[in-house]
Amino acid sequence: MANTEILLESGTNEIEVMQFTIFGELYGINVAKVLEIMMADKVKPIPHSHDAVEGIFKPRETLLTVINLPKYLTGECGDKKDRDLFIITNFNKMHIAFRVHSVVGISRISWEAIQKPDKALTNGEDGVATGIAQCGDNLVTILDFEKIVAEIAPETTIQVSDIDKLGDRMQREQSIILAEDSILLTKMISDSLLRAGYTNLTTFNNGREAWEFLESIRSEPDFYMRAALLITDIEMPEMDGHRLTKLVKEDENMKNMPVIIFSSLINEEMRVKGKQLGADEQLSKPEIGRLVEVMDALLDRRDIK
């Protein structure tokens, strides 16, 4: 939504969270993913689809898939009520509608106020919560909508096999830094880069951890040997990718390190923000093949210099 453009363009490390309810429980979504909210409409079922896929509907000439979020999260549909809402989203270059029971409001908070859930609750794997946020007096579960869609439609996420389409490749020794909070996506990106010949990869769970590492080596003469290029997501607990990009590009010792923002949120508005912050390139997930091509070009350009 429009107000989010003002928030993120300066790398303030803030997020606007839209709160909604499912069976009385509070959940949240980044407002940057939300196109609009509308009353639930009649949906045409799709045969042989995932249990959580209600079907399709067509508002204003745009065909949208509807995911029943109550069904996905709890296994129970409950009674579909006339007051149910559809949250229409835009991420990963897809428009998807999610059924919810009500929308409560929007809170502006710092990413520092969002904590990653304990992995012990999910057997060391990513759950469907990307973080737990304190919004006023309430604890709000921020859902990982990319993971939800990836589980329902795996073909829409990163495909390691896309690297094979790039042809034969040489091994590359440059040190790559990756800031990505999703365990699933970190593995997919890491496997893809390894297949592409990038064998020297250091990963961090959020922008804060990546920044602390970069700060710790910023004065070393071999800085660019240890951090040749940074790939960062945008949405991360503690410090987001826009804030990380801003800090790197404002630092005299780091500013020449290429920064690629690799996020599900990339659109024209986000592209403007990233450019203002100094990002060298911005790519939308799941374009992993294009990511490798851009990495090659940026690193080759730096080697020539």
Predicted regions and their residues:
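Flexible, small-/acidic-enriched active-site or ligand-binding loops
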Residues: 37-53, 103-134
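Acidic catalytic/metal-coordinating carboxylates
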Residues: 206, 240-243
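Alpha4 helix (beta4-alpha4-beta5 surface) of REC/receiver domains from two-component response regulators
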Residues: 243, 266-284, 289
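Conserved acidic segment of CheY-like receiver
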Residues: 24, 172-193, 230
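Receiver (REC) domain active-site loop signature in two-component systems and cognate sites
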Residues: 61, 236
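Acidic, metal-coordinating helix/loop segments flanking the phosphotransfer/catalytic sites
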Residues: 203-229
